[in-house]
């Protein structure tokens, strides 16, 4: 198995107290940290009222963009996405706060949900979830939950976004095809959970962490898988699929997060599994695993995103403590 080695470019100490990393992004392709190469991180203030904040990381430091109290929706999470050198935050299914230039004042772009009241794309009971989404264009896959609300995602849709015309609309609302996975549960109608989504070269990827409704931190997952899917949720190809994880009696599970690169980040739930709690990467093209070696003194950091040779890491210890921008030194 190959190994990806990281070296530290810059470490950021946080002046304010934040909860944890909701999702991340990158604003430009770049092999080194330079003017215009910036990383994004969606988090939330610990102190009341707990405002959501986008941290923009560059060689000059951290720019904090606090989202308004109207983003504190009890039902819907904000969703971060990037497009070239700009980014947007989807608010409550209805509009996009679109940040350009110096990000000081966002444009508000409404999202159309069908053209007639009786033909809405998103059902009323759909709830927006923050899980990391990556796209190389203007079609942004977004995670949702409906009917039963655990803060998870079992549904998705596509946001069709036109940054030139300042228009956006929802396209479709689907679940991932359950029966396509070897270890699906016939006893329930629960659709596979969605950890992360990616649209690249007109191909839609989804990572599912199985179907279990119970606490995976307590009981483990039933299975996990990576697949190419259609916008209607049909599984076109499985790139990765685990065994039935509960068959051996040992708790197990792996979460997946797409990046702005060919790699999917795989994060095990438990430290006593076969991976010893260490993250791995999975190449979407080569379909091979890669180990990750963090820079010295940063072994407790977790990897959250990759773009070119840039890697975004963060340290969580009862709150978000530290953020790192690293460079890929090489692959051995």
List the predicted regions and their residue ranges:
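Short loop/turn segments that connect beta-strands within beta-propeller blades
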Residues: 57-60, 101-104, 162-165, 230-232, ...
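Blade-level signature of beta-propeller repeat domains, shared across WD40, Kelch, NHL, RCC1
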Residues: 301-332
């Amino acid at each position: 198995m190959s190994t990806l080695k990281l070296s530290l470019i810059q470490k950021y100490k946080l002046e304010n107290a934040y909860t944890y990393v909701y999702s991340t992004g990158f604003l430009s392709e770049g092999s080194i940290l330079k003017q215009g190469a910036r990383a994004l991180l969606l988090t939330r203030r610990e102190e009341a009222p707990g405002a959501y904040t986008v941290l923009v990381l560059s060689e000059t430091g951290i720019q904090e963009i606090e989202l308004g109290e109207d983003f504190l929706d009890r039902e819907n999470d904000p969703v971060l996405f990037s497009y070239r050198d700009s980014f947007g935050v989807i608010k409550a299914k209805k509009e996009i706060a679109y940040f350009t230039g110096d990000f000081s004042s966002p444009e508000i772009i409404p999202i159309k949900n069908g053209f007639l009241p009786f033909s809405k794309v998103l059902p009323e009971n759909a709830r927006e979830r923050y899980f990391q989404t990556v796209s190389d264009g203007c079609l942004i896959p977004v995670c949702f939950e409906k009917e039963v609300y655990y803060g998870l995602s079992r549904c998705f849709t596509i946001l069709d976004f036109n940054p030139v015309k300042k228009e956006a609309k929802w396209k479709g609302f689907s679940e991932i095809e359950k029966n396509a996975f070897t270890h699906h549960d016939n006893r329930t109608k629960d659709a596979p959970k969605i950890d992360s989504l990616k649209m690249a070269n007109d191909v839609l990827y989804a990572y599912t962490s199985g179907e279990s409704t119970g606490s995976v931190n307590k009981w483990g997952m039933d299975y996990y898988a990576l697949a190419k899917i259609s916008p209607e949720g049909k599984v076109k190809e499985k790139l990765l699929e685990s065994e039935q994880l509960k068959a051996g009696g040992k708790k197990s599970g792996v979460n997946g997060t797409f990046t702005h690169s060919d790699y999917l980040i795989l994060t095990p739930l438990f430290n006593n599994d076969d991976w010893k709690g260490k993250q791995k990467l999975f190449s979407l093209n080569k379909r091979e695993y890669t180990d990750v070696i963090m820079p010295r003194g940063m072994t407790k950091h977790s990897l959250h995103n990759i773009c070119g040779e840039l890697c975004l890491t963060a340290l969580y210890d009862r709150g978000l403590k530290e953020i790192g921008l690293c460079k890929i030194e090489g692959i051995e």
